[in-house]
Every structure is written in structure tokens, then in C-alpha cells.
């Protein structure tokens, strides 16, 4: 990936080896990584909702990798997320999207208990970096640019990530950023050409776009741009912009900054319940982003305004944002590739059939794991 300026680095980046991680300790049975002899486990680096990650050495190449061990067979939703992530990450070949290097096949269908996905080893994530050191404006620009570069590829393929947040943005000591965790991704267009309908739960609350909270019906690529705005704000201030404790507090926090929606924006809200709730709130004036982020540059403030626009129809797109002056030092139209369209049926993958029996889903996963 070319850049027009020298890139920032993360101080002591090699000292933090936790990448896809939380601070919880995994259960003992999760620590049993059954790796083929060409891999040597180095150490545990993280735990997620239904899997753990270890650093390992691929002995034939000498390459250090991350091995993600997923146990999806306790719930159909975990199976569907695993299938979706494998299909999507195999589709994308992009510098700012985490790639699958290999999937370790089980000896047989009967012995398929866990799924082992081999990925690039990243040293940390943006969540940890924000909380461990102040970020310069150069850091904020470069990370924002790389997020937008990944979104351009995803959105050109007709894919919405739907769960962008700092912990899903993996980093190395050179500040290379890769978007991870595609388990909640969806197609922007359902079969038949109609906009996709939102499922009830998408995205971690603090990064959810208002159209998700207020039931605008259709979801679009714009929800990822809202999340990007929340992430940029968090990088600039070292704290979340909208840390809502529940649905109502989340809406209140958003409106306390963006102000009461205009009539035009209000008309986009389809849910009668949501419209009634908004009407019940007192009028709130918009707060200046410059007042909220006094140290931020005018370009950073302007991009924030365009990303954190209430109405998704008026929100800046990834392709437009890449041309914004805030990321001009890195923008290179010839090095910001699109991706081939992803068939909607592969992205949405039984999204309305989450009552599928686990044996059926296990067979689909077995077929996907053994696909070469």
C-alpha cells in the first residue's frame, strides 16, 4: 500500500502480543490446540465469545501466524457466523482486511469439534492502543485512511461489515491496520434487488448508527461510515463518544451532540415507536465538534461532521471520504482497489433461518473447511 508520507509507528508495539483478545481467561479445555506437526504453538493471545487464538510457528516457512480455534457447534448462530466469516475472508484479498492463510481440516466429519483458522499474526488492536498511549494526528489520519480503504473494497463487493469497533481493527508495530471479525456482515442488497432488512442486533451499541437504533428499515453501507466516525472520535479523545448504557441512553447521547433531527431526517424514521420516543424528548441544539475536540485539526472536525451525519442518505461514503483532505497524505486513487461483487446469498447465508439444525450446519462447515 503506497503512501505519500512516512507512516507513524506504535511505541513498543512488539511488547503487546494480544490481538483478537479480551482480558478474560479462557476455559481449560480451550487451551488444547490440536495442531498438525508443521505448526508449533507459541502462546495464547486472546479469547472471544466462542473461540480462542494462539500465536504459532509454521515450521516449514518459519512464519509466525495466528491460529483461531472456534467451537461453533453449541448454537446455530455461531455456526452461521463461522460460515460467513470463512466465505467472506476467502473472497477478499486486501491489505487492510485480515486474510485466511489456511484452514486446518479435521481427519473426518465425526471428529470435527473445532474449526482451526490460520491467519496473519497481528500484534495488537486499536482498542488496546487507544488505551495504552496517546495517538498523534498522524496516527489518527493513517488509521482512518486504512479503515476507509478497507470499506471501499467491502462496499464495492456489496458487503456491509456491521460491527466495526476498535477491538475489530488489528494492528502491528508498523501501524498496518486490518479489519477483522466478519461474523455479522451482510449483503447490501438482498436477492431480488431490494435493500436488505436489518436484523434486530447489529454492532456493538456504542458504534451503532442511529438508523439501526431507530429502525429506518433498510440498512446500507452508511452504517459502517457512522462506526468509522465513532472510531475517529475515540482516537482523537481517547474515550468513546457515545458510551450508552442501554437503548434509551444511546439515543439520548447521540441527540445531545447531533441535536434534534430536522423534519426531513425525522421523516426517515419508519418505526412509530421510535418516532414517538423522539417526539417525547425536549429540543436539543447541535453541539460543535470543535468544542468537543478542541485539539483536533479543522480537517479532522470536517470529516467527523460528514461521518457522524444523522441521516444515512446524507452521510459521506467510503470512496468520498478517501478524497477528504484529512487523509490526503495517504490517498492514492490508483492504490485503493475495489473488490469483485459477492453473491448476496453467500453473504446473507441463511440469515433468516437461524433455526437450522446444528448437524446440517456442521455438514456445511465441514464442506467449507475441506474446500481447496
Swiss-Prot record:
Its EC number is 2.7.11.24. It comes from Schizosaccharomyces pombe (strain 972 / ATCC 24843). It catalyses: L-seryl-[protein] + ATP = O-phospho-L-seryl-[protein] + ADP + H(+); L-threonyl-[protein] + ATP = O-phospho-L-threonyl-[protein] + ADP + H(+). Residues 1-29 are annotated as: Disordered. The keyword Phosphoprotein applies. Pfam families: Pkinase. Belongs to the protein kinase superfamily. CMGC Ser/Thr protein kinase family. MAP kinase subfamily. The modification Phosphotyrosine is found at residue 201. This is Mitogen-activated protein kinase spk1. GO terms for biological process: intracellular signal transduction; pheromone response MAPK cascade; pheromone-dependent signal transduction involved in conjugation with cellular fusion. InterPro entries: Kinase-like_dom_sf, MAP_kinase, MAP_kinase_CS, MAPK_p38-like, Prot_kinase_dom, Protein_kinase_ATP_BS, Ser/Thr_kinase_AS. Residues 39-327 form the Protein kinase domain. The TXY motif contains the threonine and tyrosine residues whose phosphorylation activates the MAP kinases. The lineage of its organism: Eukaryota, Fungi, Dikarya, Ascomycota, Taphrinomycotina.
Amino acid at each position: 500500500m503506497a503512501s505519500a508520507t512516512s507512516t507513524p509507528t506504535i511505541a513498543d508495539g512488539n511488547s503487546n502480543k494480544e490481538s483478537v483478545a479480551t482480558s478474560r481467561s479462557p476455559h481449560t479445555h480451550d487451551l488444547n490446540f490440536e495442531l498438525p506437526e508443521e505448526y508449533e504453538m507459541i502462546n495464547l493471545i486472546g479469547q472471544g465469545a466462542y473461540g480462542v487464538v494462539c500465536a504459532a510457528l509454521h515450521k516449514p516457512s518459519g512464519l509466525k501466524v495466528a491460529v483461531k480455534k472456534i467451537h461453533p457447534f453449541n448454537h446455530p448462530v455461531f455456526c452461521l457466523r463461522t460460515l460467513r466469516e470463512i466465505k467472506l475472508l476467502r473472497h477478499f484479498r486486501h491489505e487492510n482486511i485480515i486474510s485466511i492463510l489456511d484452514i486446518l481440516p479435521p481427519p473426518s466429519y465425526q471428529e470435527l469439534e473445532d474449526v482451526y483458522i490460520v491467519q496473519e499474526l497481528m500484534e495488537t488492536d486499536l482498542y488496546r492502543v487507544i488505551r495504552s498511549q496517546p495517538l498523534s494526528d498522524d496516527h489518527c489520519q493513517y488509521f482512518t485512511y486504512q479503515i476507509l480503504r478497507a470499506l471501499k473494497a467491502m462496499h464495492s463487493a456489496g458487503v456491509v461489515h456491521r460491527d466495526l469497533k476498535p477491538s475489530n481493527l488489528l494492528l502491528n508495530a508498523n501501524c498496518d491496520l486490518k479489519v477483522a471479525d466478519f461474523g455479522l456482515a451482510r449483503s447490501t442488497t438482498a436477492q431480488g434487488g431490494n435493500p436488505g432488512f436489518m436484523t434486530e442486533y447489529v454492532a456493538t451499541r456504542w458504534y451503532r448508527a442511529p438508523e439501526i437504533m431507530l429502525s429506518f428499515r433498510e440498512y446500507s453501507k452508511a452504517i459502517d461510515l457512522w462506526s468509522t466516525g465513532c472510531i475517529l472520535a475515540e482516537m482523537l479523545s481517547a474515550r468513546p463518544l457515545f458510551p450508552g448504557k442501554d437503548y434509551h441512553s444511546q439515543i439520548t447521547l447521540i441527540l445531545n451532540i447531533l441535536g434534534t433531527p430536522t423534519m426531513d431526517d425525522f421523516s426517515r424514521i419508519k418505526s412509530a415507536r421510535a418516532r414517538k420516543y423522539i417526539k417525547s424528548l425536549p429540543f436539543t441544539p447541535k453541539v460543535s465538534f470543535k468544542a468537543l475536540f478542541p485539539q483536533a485539526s479543522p480537517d479532522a472536525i470536517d470529516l467527523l461532521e460528514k461521518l457522524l451525519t444523522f441521516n444515512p442518505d446524507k452521510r459521506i461514503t467510503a470512496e468520498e471520504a478517501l478524497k477528504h483532505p484529512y487523509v490526503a497524505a495517504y490517498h492514492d486513487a490508483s492504490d485503493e482497489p475495489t473488490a469483485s461483487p459477492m453473491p448476496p446469498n453467500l453473504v446473507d447465508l441463511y440469515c433468516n433461518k437461524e433455526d437450522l439444525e446444528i448437524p446440517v450446519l456442521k455438514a456445511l462447515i465441514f464442506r467449507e473447511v475441506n474446500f481447496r
